[in-house]
């Protein structure tokens, strides 16, 4: 009898222990740690400073970290900045390509530049992604899968639609926390992780990354209480967390990278993942298999903070719109001329013209929030693109007109 009691008691203890273990595993927080060194192409400095100082800091510092810390993954956005790395720092660029191939230097954002997404036309936004993806495919044999805009001043309802039509699956930003005017009350962002539905009903996964300048000092992040608390804001028990630097490029601090490494090896209640910017989105595909994901159907504007961006530096907005319209007209005429066999399609000229003015749609450039000297470079590039589009349009129309039979009876 006593043996039976002992056996039953032991079974209950073991079952209870197993249940507690399963329950702990079930409740374990998952933290996707997304490193970044967001670099403003122009803001309180001009493009020359960006190329000579900040681009160099970004590539050199992160190559050092990638060699020193085996779990470190770096995310960096903006195809034009990769092009500058290739032009100005070719030796480091070739070294970086090896880490891209290994998946440790991650191409974030899919686009030619981290542009404003409210002032540019839809055509420009799609071109921005197309130009970026083309560059990444040709240079690295890879493409991006997400829209990565940590620092833009609001996001229109068309963005999920544009993203899905370009084959992208996710969107992240930290800027929604700036919607801190009482006007927003408790609706700064609809959720921290969920689905965002566009105007046509197509959806991307949305992740709020929090402050991209977050730092830690060599602590075990698997036991970090802040990460645990932030994860409670989603029904997924999951956190998407930027860390690194903002505006001037560079890299996360040594202490921050060590903290992520310690967290990966730690045994606390947080499962720490050194993540690419799109890993969370890929882990939840297909989205319709996850009914627990909340859905937002609307726009995410910054009505207070970003309002002046729609009118500041009116000349930039004029040049930008002229380029959008002239570029469209030039391409239509050039296609017609080639189809008629009267001219060769000027692909290189048109591509370079689009690239040159589209990167000035950057969220501190076209928006009118940079220093006056920065616009000396911006206006110059806008005018060069206008000239190139104008020449392509004129030559194409002349080629078409030269083949037209305008003879009529007198």
Identify the function of each model-found stretch.
Residues 21-410:
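Catalytic-domain carbohydrate-binding cleft regions of carbohydrate-active enzymes
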Residues 4-14:
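Sec-dependent N-terminal signal peptides
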Residues 15-20:
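C-terminal segment of classical bacterial N-terminal signal peptides
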Residues 1-5, 21:
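Short, Lys/Arg-enriched, disordered terminal segments
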